Every structure is written in structure tokens, then in C-alpha cells.
UniProtKB/Swiss-Prot annotation:
Keywords, alphabetical: Coiled coil, GTPase activation, Metal-binding, Phosphoprotein, Zinc, Zinc-finger
Matching Pfam families: C1_1, GMIP-like_FCH, RHG29_45_N, RhoGAP
Protein name, per record: Rho GTPase-activating protein 29
Skewed-composition ranges (Acidic residues): 1256-1266
Quaternary structure and interacting proteins, as annotated: Interacts with PTPN13/PTPL1. Interacts with RAP2A via its coiled coil domain. Interacts with RASIP1.
Domain Rho-GAP: 673-888
Species name: Mus musculus (Mouse)
Record's function text: GTPase activator for the Rho-type GTPases by converting them to an inactive GDP-bound state. Has strong activity toward RHOA, and weaker activity toward RAC1 and CDC42. May act as a specific effector of RAP2A to regulate Rho. In concert with RASIP1, suppresses RhoA signaling and dampens ROCK and MYH9 activities in endothelial cells and plays an essential role in blood vessel tubulogenesis.
Polar residues bias locations: 483-495, 1072-1081
Site (Arginine finger): 709
Gene: Arhgap29
GO biological process: regulation of small GTPase mediated signal transduction; signal transduction
Length: 1266
């Protein structure tokens, strides 16, 4: 429509004048060109509108800068941007060029340059910039008129022709410089001339500093662009190398293909050029471009700031001298006024004296003298003020001269700095483009050579070679005999037969030319031998023949075999649920063409991750839950045919779960779940999260700086945690960053309800950390001491702490110990690369200390003492990492598996509350060969053959009792019923073994180390000891064994079978006679004092002594029973792990006939019976100090028959009766079935009476019967 109006107006002007003028002719010519080229081009109109809109925005920005900030630099920048936009518009649209428009731009530039910004304030702002605003409006009006005339077709070339040549070549960017700043033509200036030009400007320093700052920003942008470009090119080269390697391996196995050598050379050229480009990128990132330019930029910034500070100091000094000059000037004026007043007063006094009488002459003379004196003083002050003013003027002049000199020096320094920076920028720019040119030149030459080689190829040449090779009789015999497989001759309706696999395709012998696999489909009716029939099928799949996308193909997978193309009936659609295990088992096995990851079917155009390529997907028909995002998958979802994994199509790009080729397990809650739930599913008890993360970090991040300290991406960390819960072992974590993997590992350890080091061992490990701190302080104090070299006390302390830590760690369950061992070993490998990753054992201790050892969570407020324990936690982990090779022996502890008689696996209870399983004699020799230095042991235990065999027979019984006592702590009644039922079954089978042990002629010999020369004090007793039992226990002897066994199961203490060396001992008066007996591989008496407090608050159970005699007494039976509650006098020491034969002896004694027993010979128990009763929770420790003696009860004599058992007697001062399975009532053993009372306080233990000790020694020598 606009073009129609233009033509109509043009015709009216032409015919109205009668003859067309030159201007009209020119207008017509311009209009024709515009109409033909631009008016009918909508893209041109759109571009013109955008340019005009940009110009209007630049005008508004300039006006807003003037109104808001009034900063000179900002306004000049906006003006330069406006002129630059105007220049670009005129260069694009030549018809808009005009003298009026350029004149308006020059006027605007001149007005802006003429403004003195130092005089601008809020009051006179509008007056000063009035002319500038009018110039802006003039420029906008002129541009609008020219644009309107252009659109209406009234623009002629006369306005362009009137432009002088010098004006046409002038740039709008140089208008301000040419019209205002430069008095002469533009040209090259010497450095001195540049400095002189800047010295004439009052703001020369500010301009130079502003240019330096702009140069720094400009350089920063250039460096950022180059770095980003190089990173993209580096990533691209890596992908190109992978693609070239994969393609090369694919086409290398194919034979008789056209231009194969040419494409192989092209791939090699790509690989070579990619390697060269990587070297070029590394050089540019190092010393060829980035580093020199960044160094020069930093130097520029540093010197610019120093120069700016120096210039401000000089300006402040000049300002101070000018202020002092103004004050001196005001003082001079004030002194001058005072002098004038004094002088006029003196003049009036003289006149009064002349006109006065003689009588008043004396008084007037005095006044005259006084005023004359004041006048002289005022004159003197005037002279002093003048002198001070002159000095100030001199100082101002000196400061101004100094400022000028400083200004000249600063300008020279800035000019030199800018030239140096430009020189560096020039050098690195030359390096950049020269290296890129060399890279492009080599690539161009290789491409040219490949182009020339491709022109020489004769079409069909390779096919002819292929036919010649297949027609040879010798080749046919070799193929039929060695390579090709028999093919069926059954007819196919489609004309194709399915090939087996890539291995089924025939290979030609090496004597022929290099054979390549055929990529084109041959004719279906080709006839010939079996070798030819193997090639007659389709050589590529449907997706390849139709130009399908190969984006979803893995770069590492092999190419599709020639027999992959065949037809097949569609499979039955999926039911869409995760429970379709029957469908998974019943469906037909996949064909060779569909077995590979490339057979994606309808999903070949979907972007997939490396893990997604391992699956074999099909369409999902019903809604279910996505394994990647945990969202509901509607109909646009996919399901794996093998593992039944379901996810959205859009989630295939980020899927990290690999196909396990079997049904995928359900989601397992790992983070925040109980440790035993995850550990029991692993054979070694180490959670798979710990193993996966640690192995991945060791593979690629041991040298990464800040490993475990730098945080990862929160979103990616949460996604990895979700993937581990969904896929467990099948998660591919190679796509995640190392810091994300570290965050996942730390998060798992932090969210454990109970850390690896259990809550019950927290205090012992904290005490150990304090000892470590004490040893470190001593080591620092004695480091420079010469006596320390002669007496290495520190090394002994370190060894003592090492052995103590080993003993403490043995108290951990097997899964906790193995997991801690694995983690500490991994952290040790991280510390080995501390020079690269900057993470030593101290840093790792600070990070992992609060996660590996922490107190039981409470609601108490955080105090300073609790905060101080963080350092102890970090110090302990640092110690474990530093001495990991000495603390951990390198072998993992085996997992304990509980199996019932029926063959079913028993429910696994919390291993944290169970003692360690007993070790075999071989294991005791290897694991406990070293004695802790803080023990006072003197001898080692030598176990006899009888002990080892009896240990093997009674292991299952000990294990059952240990499990039962540990489960006795549980409060849930249902669990108690189930567990007791299971252990009753185990006890029945175990009792039979115990009878065999009792009947065994071999003895269980325990050696005493009471004497220092390792000689036994007494010979082994050949007769049975008398029996001391309560009444109710004696009545049970006549009952059936099953009734007794059901009751005896509850009386077994788990601690006597434990491997825990931390036991509480009695404080004896006579330390010289203390016995140190060792049973089952560890010392009973060697207990450190810091460990004694662990079991002080526990409750204890009163036990009785049972001694089976070897003869049948004929006397009556008398039994004394008493109630003995826990008090210091009867406080039992912890009984160590006893031999397995002890239990068997007690069980066998119960099953034998009754015999005569006598009254107890030690302290009487408080309880009415020997069975354990839980203490009243309301009683206090102080109340337990009372002791009540009960009368004895006479019982009819009962005979107890038992086989003779020879027992080696230990010292009576030992902590337990080792030869028989019972202990005296004065030594009740602590019970592990009841938890420790928190309100109970540790009490002192009453020392044993010396008289009672002597009496027991006498009984050892001479048996006494009642």
C-alpha cells in the first residue's frame, strides 16, 4: 500500500511540471531502487524498524544520564554509544545519509563537550544543559524528517551529492574529537605530544585512569571469550576423537567397501587434528594467550590504583595549602581593618588635644600615648599577616608546581603502562590467530588431499573385487570348510532369511585383499554357494536404510551385524506394572538383532544416557512410578523388557540405573536407615554406598584439590541419593562430579542413626583421644630435648595407645568394624596424595570426626564442654588415619550368621550389643599375640588339645546363649517369644553336645600364672569337689532335663562368652598375690583403670557355687541361702570369658543324680533364690549397703551322681572359678541382661577377707565334705 501511494504521488509531480527535472529524475531512480530492493522486502522493513527503535533508545538513555547522574564519564559513554548506533544505521541504509543529520550530530557533540561539569549543581542544571537538550531534540527531529522522506520516496541523491568528500569519510565516532578536542587534523603523535595534549586538559589524569580501567574490563571480556571458546573446542575435540575411534573400529571389520581406506585416513586425520588442537588449546591456556594477558591486566589494575591514590594525595595537599592561603588572606584583611580603626582613633585624639584647654592637656597626652601604642601594635600585626600571606602564596605555588610535575609523571607512567599492555595484547593476539591459522592450514591441506583422492575412485571397483573373490574355487573351499555355517533352504515369504549374529558372517582368508563388511543390501535372488548366501541378506537395519538418526547409539558399541535386518512379529505389549515377573520369564528369548543396545526400535530418536542404552525398552501401557524422578508415568513412558525398569521418555537422557538383566528390586531406604539393615545384605558387612563412592573417588579424584572439603551441587547430590535408593549397585555414578559423590558419602555417614563407633563406646574413645592429645603435647615439649633421644617415652606411649585402640575397635560388631576399616583405608589413600589434593589427615579428621563418633543425641542444650569434644573427635579420626596400617591388620572380620535347626536363618539382632564370637586357637595366636602395654601380664596362655576340641563342640551352644542374652534386652514381648522359641530348639541340640563333652575322657586344662616361674601351685585335682546349692536348685536335680534346661537358658550370661577384654576387677588389699589368669586367648586381670567405669553402674546377679564330688557321701545335706543385693561389699567383678567346657560341666552336673552338698563357704547371697531378679528401680545405691543374713534351711540328703572330671584349679583370688562352671556366692557375676541405671553412682568394692582367702586355699588342698 505504501508503494502504491509513492507511485501515485510521483506521477502527479511529473505530469504537473510538463517535463521531469533532474531532481525528480534522481528521485525516481532512487525510489525505483528502494522500491525494488527494500520497499517490497518485509525483512528489510523489520530491520529498519529495529534500528530506528535502537536509535530512539540511545537518545533517551543520553537524556536520562544527563538528568540523573550528571557524571562526565557516563554522559560521554552514552554519547559515544549514540554516535556509534547512528553510524551503523547510516552504513546499513545509505539513503538516510544527509548533511543536516551529520551537522546535528556535530552540534550535539560540541554542546556536550562544552559543558563544565565542575560547576553543575541541582540549581543550575537545567540552565547549563538547556542547549544540550535542544541539540538532542534537533537531532531527533532531523532524523525523523529524513526517515519520513525516505519512506515516502522524497529522498533524493542531491543531499548526498552535496556532502564534501572529507565529510563523507569522517566517522561519527571521531566527531567529538575532530570538532572540539583536536585543533588540527588527525594524525600520529609522538609520546611527548600525547602527554602535552593531555596536560592541557584539566581532567587529563581522570581521563587516563578511566581509559586504563576500561582497558582492564575490555581485556577481561576478551580473556573470558577465549577461555570459553577453548573449553568448548576442547570438549568438542574429545567427542570427535571418541566418535572417530568408534567409527574406525566399526568400519575396520567391514570388507569390500568403497573408499574405505579414504575414510579411514579421514578418521585418522580427525584424530590427529584433534590431538593437535588439544595441544594448541593447552598452549593458549598456558603461556601463549591467557596467562600473559591476565598477568598484564592484574598489573594494570594494581598500578592504576596506586596512581589514583597518589593523585588524590597530591590534590589533598594542594587543597590544604589553598585553604591556608584563604585563611591568611582573611587574616590580613582583618588586621588591616584593625589598623585603620587604631589610626583613626589616634587622629581623633590628636585633634582633641589641640582643641582642649591647658588643664586637660595631661590627661589627653596619656590617651594619645596609649592610642599611638595601639596603632603601632596594629601595624605590626598587619605586617605579620602580610608575611604569613606571602608564605601561603609561596606554598600554594610550590604545591601547584608539584602537582603539575606529578601530573606529568603520572601521565607518562600511564602512557608507558598502556603501551606495554597494548604490546602484550598484540603479542598474544598474534599467537592466537597464528596458531589457529596453522591448525586450519593443516586441516585444509589434509582435506584437499582427501578430496583429490576421492576423485580418483572408480565406482563399482570394490564390488568387482568382491565378486572376483567370491567366485574363486579355492576361496569357496576355504569358506565352506572353515568359515561359513550351513544355511537353511526353507523359503521365506519376504525373500529374506534371518542371520544369526556377527560371528556367523563369513570371513575371507588373509591371502586375498583386505575384506570389509558390506554395508549395502544385495539382491535377494542372488545365487551361489553358501558363502554368497550368507551375504545376500539386508546389510543394514530399517533405521539406517531410511536415514534414521544415530544419536542414541553408543560410541563404544560394535556396529550392527549384516544379518540384523529381518522381519519379526510384534511382541505382546507390557502390562505396565513392576510385578510382571512371569511375563519376564515366559517371553521368548531376544533375537541377535535385538540383543544389542542399538536395537532401540521406536526410541531410536530419543536422547539417552549411557545407562539407558543398556536397557531394552518397550512402550508402557498403564500408569506406574518412574524410577528416575519418582513421578507418576502416564502413557508416554517406557519399560525395560529385562529388568522391568519404568521411566518417562524425557528421563531417559538423565537415567543412571544400568540394566541388571533381571527384575529390579524395589526402592530401599538407605539414607537415615539403620546401619544393620544395609550391612546385612552385603557379604562383608560394608554398605554398597560406601564401596561405590570410595572406589569412584579413588579412580578419578584422589588428586582433586579440596576433595571432601568443597561442596557439590545440591540438586545433583539429591538426585544421586535417590538413584542409589532406587538402583543400589546398578547406579552409574561416572556422570556425576567428584564433589557430588563426596557429598553423598558424607551425607550417608551423617544420617546414620548410630555411627560406626557405637554410642556405648563413645566415652572410651573420647578418653583415648584425650590421651592422644596428652601424648602429642609431651612429644612437642620433648621434641628438642636431648634426653628424649636417650629415653623414648613418647614412642612407648604411642604404642600403648595403638594397642588400646585395637582392643577398643575389637569390641565393635563385625559389620561396623569392617565398614570403619574400609573407610579409614580409603581416607588413608586420600592422605597419600595430600600434596595434590591439599587434604591431610588433620583436615579429614575435622570433616569425618563428628560423623564417625558422636554422643547419644539428647535434648540437653549445647554447652561449651560439648563443643570442645569436636576437637577430640577430629583428633581421634586423625589418629586412626595416620596409624591405620598398624591399627587395622588388613583382614576383615567375618559376618556372624545365625541358623536354626530347621535350616532357616534366624532374625539377626543388633550386633552392637552382642559380644565378639570366640576365636579358634590359631586365630588367638595371631590376633592376640601382642599384649597391651597398659596391661601387667606376665605369661601367655597355652591351650591344650582338649581345650581346642571342647571349644569346637560347644561353639554352637555358646553362640545360642550369647544371642539369647543379647535379645533379652529387648522390651518387645512378641520378639521375645519368637526368639526364645528358636533358642529352645537350639538348646535341645546343644545339650546333647554338652553331655558328650562331659563324657569325654579328655580334660580341659587351664594353666595358672600365679607363680613367676610358671610352675603350677597344686597338682590337678583327681576327685570331684562337694556341691553347694540352694534348696530349690537341689529339688530341680530330680526333675527332667527338659524342665531344667528351659529354666537354665535364662541364667546364662552373655558376657562370659564374649571376647570383650574390658572387664571390671576387684581392688584387692594384697596386690602381690593377685592372680593373672588367661582364658580363651586374653588376660582376665589386665584391665586398665579407665575401662573399669564402663560396667560400674550395671546390675549384678547373685550366683551360687556348684562343686561335683567324685564320691557318694553318706551324710545329710544342709544349705544356707540368703538375700544379697548389690552393695559395695558384695559387688561382683566382671567375669571374663570362660572356657566352653565350663558350661558343659554345669549342664552335665544338672543331669546327674544328686549327691551330698554342704553349706556355702563364702559370702552369703542376698536373694532367696539363685535366679536373677531385676532390681527395684526406686532403690538407691546407698541403701544397698545394708546386708541381711537369713537362717539356713535343712534339706534331706540327695545323692548327685556325676562322672569324674579332673580340673586344674586356679588361684582362689582369680576373678572367676575357671575349672568349674560356677562361682562363689560372694562373687556374683554382672548381668548383661539389664541396662545400666543412670542414677546409680560407682561404689567402692569391699576387699576380700584374708581369712576367707586362706580358708579357700586350705580347701583346695584338702577336700571337705558335709
Amino acid at each position: 500500500m505504501i508503494a502504491h501511494k509513492q507511485k501515485k504521488a510521483k506521477k502527479k509531480r511529473v505530469w504537473a511540471s510538463g517535463q521531469p527535472s533532474a531532481a525528480i529524475t534522481t528521485s525516481e531512480m532512487g525510489l525505483k531502487s528502494v522500491s525494488s530492493s527494500s520497499s517490497f522486502d518485509p525483512e528489510y522493513i523489520k530491520e529498519l524498524v529495529n534500528d530506528v527503535r535502537k536509535f530512539s533508545h540511545m537518545l533517551l538513555y543520553l537524556k536520562e544520564a544527563i538528568l540523573s547522574d550528571c557524571f562526565k564519564e557516563v554522559i560521554h559513554i552514552r554519547l559515544d554509544e549514540l554516535l556509534r548506533v547512528l553510524k551503523s544505521i547510516l552504513s546499513k541504509h545509505q539513503n538516510l545519509s544527509s548533511v543536516d543529520l551529520q551537522s546535528a550530530a556535530e552540534v550535539l557533540t560540541a554542546k556536550v563537550k562544552a559543558v563544565n561539569f565542575t560547576e553543575v549543581n541541582e540549581e543550575n542544571k537545567n540552565d547549563i544543559f538547556r542547549e544540550v537538550f535542544s541539540s538532542i531534540e534537533t537531532l531527533a527531529f532531523t532524523f525523523g524528517n529524513i526517515l519520513t522522506n525516505f519512506l515516502m520516496g522524497d529522498v533524493g541523491s542531491d543531499s548526498i551529492l552535496r556532502l564534501p568528500i572529507s565529510r563523507e569519510s569522517k566517522s561519527f565516532e571521531n566527531i567529538s574529537v575532530d570538532s572540539v578536542d583536536l585543533p588540527h587534523e588527525k594524525g600520529n603523535f609522538s609520546p611527548i605530544e600525547l602527554d602535552n595534549l593531555l596536560l592541557k586538559n584539566t581532567d587529563s589524569i581522570e581521563l587516563a585512569l578511566s581509559y586504563a580501567k576500561t582497558w582492564s574490563k575490555y581485556t577481561k571480556n576478551i580473556v573470558s571469550w577465549v577461555e570459553k571458546k577453548l573449553n568448548l573446542e576442547l570438549e568438542s575435540t574429545r567427542n570427535i576423537v571418541k566418535l572417530a575411534e568408534a567409527t574406525r573400529s566399526s568400519i575396520g571389520i567391514q570388507e569390500f567397501m568403497p573408499l574405505q581406506s579414504l575414510f579411514t585416513n579421514a578418521l585418522l586425520s580427525d584424530i590427529h587434528s584433534s590431538h593437535l588442537l588439544q595441544q594448541t588449546i593447552a598452549a593458549l591456556q598456558a603461556n601463549k594467550f591467557v596467562q600473559p594477558l591476565l598477568g598484564r591486566k592484574n598489573e594494570m589494575e594494581k598500578q592504576r590504583k596506586e596512581i589514583k591514590d597518589l593523585w588524590k594525595q597530591q590534590q589533598n595537599k594542594l587543597l590544604e595549602t589553598e585553604t591556608a592561603l584563604k585563611k591568611a588572606k582573611l587574616l590580613c584583611m582583618q588586621r588591616q581593618d584593625e589598623y585603620e580603626k587604631a589610626k583613626s582613633s589616634m587622629f581623633r585624639a590628636e585633634e582633641e588635644q589641640l582643641s582642649s584647654s591647658v588643664g586637660l592637656a595631661k590627661n589627653l597626652n596619656k590617651q594619645l600615648e596609649k592610642r599611638r601604642r595601639l596603632e603601632e601594635e596594629a601595624l605590626q600585626k598587619v605586617e605579620e599577616a602580610n608575611e604569613h600571606y606571602k608564605v601561603c602564596v609561596t606554598n600554594v605555588e610550590e604545591r601547584r608546581n608539584d602537582l603539575e610535575n606529578t601530573k606529568r609523571e603520572i601521565l607518562t607512567q600511564l602512557r608507558t603502562l598502556v603501551f606495554q599492555c597494548d604490546l602484550t595484547l598484540k603479542a598474544v593476539t598474534v599467537n592466537l590467530f597464528h596458531m589457529q591459522q596453522l591448525q586450519a592450514a593443516s586441516l585444509a591441506n589434509s582435506l584437499q588431499s582427501l578430496c583429490d583422492s576421492a576423485k580418483l575412485y572408480d565406482p563399482g571397483q570394490e564390488y568387482s573385487e568382491f565378486v572376483k573373490a567370491t567366485s574363486s574355487s579355492e576361496l569357496e573351499e576355504k569358506v565352506d570348510g572353515n568359515v561359513n555355517k550351513q544355511m537353511t533352504n526353507s523359503p521365506q515369504t519376504s525373500g529374506y532369511e534371518p542371520a544369526d549374529s556377527l560371528e556367523d558372517v563369513a570371513r575371507l582368508p588373509d591371502s586375498c585383499h583386505k575384506l570389509e563388511e558390506d554395508r549395502c543390501s544385495n539382491s535377494a535372488d542372488m545365487t551361489g554357494p553358501s558363502f554368497v548366501r550368507s551375504w545376500k541378506f539386508g546389510m543394514f537395519s530399517d533405521s539406517e536404510s531410511t536415514g534414521g538418526s544415530s544419536e542414541s547409539r553408543s560410541l563404544d558399541s560394535e556396529s550392527i551385524s549384516p544379518g540384523d535386518f529381518h522381519r519379526k512379529l510384534p511382541r505382546t505389549p507390557s502390562s505396565g506394572t513392576m510385578s510382571s515377573a512371569d511375563d519376564l520369564d515366559e517371553r521368548e528369548p531376544p533375537s541377535p538383532s535385538e540383543a544389542g543396545p542399538n536395537s532401540l526400535g521406536a526410541f531410536k530418536k530419543t536422547l539417552m544416557s549411557k545407562a539407558a542404552l543398556t536397557h531394552k525398552f518397550r512402550k508402557l501401557r498403564s500408569p506406574t512410578k518412574c524410577r528416575d524422578c519418582d513421578g507418576i508415568v502416564m502413557f508416554p513412558g517406557v519399560e525395560c523388557e529385562e529388568c522391568l525398569l519404568v521411566c518417562h521418555r524425557k528421563c531417559l537422557e538423565n537415567l543412571v540405573i544400568i540394566c541388571g538383566h533381571q527384575k529390579l528390586q524395589g526402592k530401599m531406604h538407605i539414607f537415615g536407615a539403620e546401619f544393620i539393615q544395609v550391612a546385612k545384605k552385603e557379604p562383608d558387612g560394608i554398605p554398597f554406598v560406601l564401596k561405590i563412592c570410595a572406589s569412584e573417588i579413588e579412580n578419578r579424584a584422589l588428586c582433586l584439590q579440596g576433595i571432601y572439603r568443597v561442596c557439590g551441587n545440591k540438586i545433583k547430590t539429591e538426585k544421586l541419593c535417590q538413584a542409589l535408593e532406587n538402583g543400589m549397585h546398578l547406579v552409574d555414578i561416572s556422570e556425576f562430579s567428584s564433589h557430588d559423590i563426596c557429598d553423598v558419602l558424607k551425607l550417608y555417614l551423617r544420617q546414620l542413626p548410630e555411627p560406626f563407633i557405637l554410642f556405648r563406646l563413645y566415652k572410651e574413645f573420647i578418653d583415648l583421644a584425650k590421651e592422644i592429645q596428652h601424648v602429642n603435647e609431651e612429644q612437642e615439649a620433648k621434641k628438642d630435648s636431648p634426653e628424649d633421644k636417650k629415653h623414648p617415652h613418647v614412642s612407648i606411649e604411642v604404642n600403648r595407645i595403638l594397642l588400646k585402640s585395637k582392643d577398643l575397635l575389637r569390641q565393635l560388631p563385625a559389620s561396623h568394624f569392617n565398614s570403619l576399616h574400609y573407610l579409614i583405608a580409603h581416607l588413608r589413600r586420600v592422605v597419600d596424595h595430600a600434596e595434590e589434593n591439599k587434604m591431610n589427615s588433620k583436615n579429614l579428621g575435622v570433616i569425618f570426626g563428628p560423623t564417625l563418633i558422636r554422643p547419644r543425641p539428647t535434648t540437653a542444650p549445647v554447652t561449651i564442654s560439648s563443643l570442645a569434644e569436636y576437637s577430640n573427635q577430629a583428633r581421634l579420626v586423625e589418629f586412626l588415619i595416620t596409624y591405620s596400617q598398624k591399627i587395622f591388620d588388613g583382614s576383615l572380620q567375618p559376618q556372624a550368621v545365625v541358623i536354626s535347626n530347621t535350616g532357616a536363618v534366624a532374625p539377626q539382632v543388633d550386633q552392637g550389643y552382642l559380644p565378639k564370637p570366640l576365636l579358634s586357637p590359631d586365630e588367638r595366636d595371631t590376633d592376640h599375640s601382642m599384649k597391651p602395654l597398659f596391661f601387667s601380664s606376665k605369661e601367655d596362655i597355652r591351650s591344650s588339645d582338649c581345650e581346642s576340641k571342647s571349644f569346637e563342640l560347644t561353639t554352637s551352644f555358646e553362640e545360642s546363649e550369647r544371642r539369647q542374652n543379647a535379645l533379652g534386652k529387648c522390651d518387645a514381648p512378641l520378639l521375645d517369644n519368637k526368639v526364645h522359641l528358636l533358642f529352645d530348639q537350639e538348646h535341645e541340640s546343644a545339650s546333647q553336645k554338652m553331655e558328650d563333652v562331659c563324657k569325654s575322657p579328655k580334660l580341659l586344662l587351664l594353666k595358672s600364672n600365679r607363680a613367676a616361674n610358671s610352675v603350677q601351685r597344686h597338682t590337678p585335682r583327681t576327685k570331684m569337689r562337694p556341691v553347694s546349692l540352694p534348696v530349690d536348685r537341689l529339688l530341680l536335680l530330680a526333675s527332667s532335663p527338659t524342665e531344667r534346661s528351659s529354666r537354665d537358658v535364662g541364667n546364662v550370661d552373655s558376657d562370659k562368652f564374649g571376647k570383650n577384654p574390658a572387664f571390671e576387677g576387684l581392688h584387692r588389699k594384697d596386690n602381690s598375690n593377685t592372680t593373672r589368669s588367661k582364658v580363651n586367648g586374653f588376660d582376665q586381670q589386665n584391665v586398665q583403670k579407665s575401662w573399669d567405669t564402663q560396667y560400674v553402674r550395671n546390675n549384678f546377679t547373685a550366683k551360687t557355687t556348684m562343686i561335683v564330688p567324685s564320691a557318694y557321701p553318706e551324710k545329710g545335706l544342709t544349705v544356707n541361702t540368703g538375700n544379697n543385693r548389690d552393695h559395695p561389699g558384695s559387688k561382683a567383678h566382671a567375669e571374663p570369658a570362660r572356657a566352653a567346657g565350663d558350661v558343659s560341666e554345669r549342664r552335665s552336673s544338672d543331669s546327674c543324680p544328686a549327691t551330698a552338698v554342704r553349706a556355702p563357704r563364702t559370702l552369703q547371697p542376698q536373694h532367696w533364690t539363685t535366679f536373677y531378679k531385676p532390681p527395684n528401680p526406686t532403690f538407691s545405691v546407698r541403701g544397698t549397703e545394708e546386708k541381711t543374713a537369713l537362717p539356713s534351711i535343712a534339706v534331706p540328703p540327695v545323692l548327685v551322681h556325676a562322672p569324674q572330671i579332673h580340673v586344674t584349679k586356679s588361684d582362689p583370688d582369680s576373678e572367676a572359678t575357671l575349672a568349674c562352671p560356677v562361682q562363689t556366692s560372694g562373687q556374683p557375676k554382672e548381668s548383661s541382661e539389664e541396662p545400666a541405671l543412670p542414677e546409680g553412682t560407682p561404689t567402692c568394692q569391699r576387699p576380700r577377707l584374708k581369712r576367707m582367702q586362706q580358708f579357700e586355699d586350705l580347701e583346695d588342698e584338702i577336700p571337705q565334705f558335709v
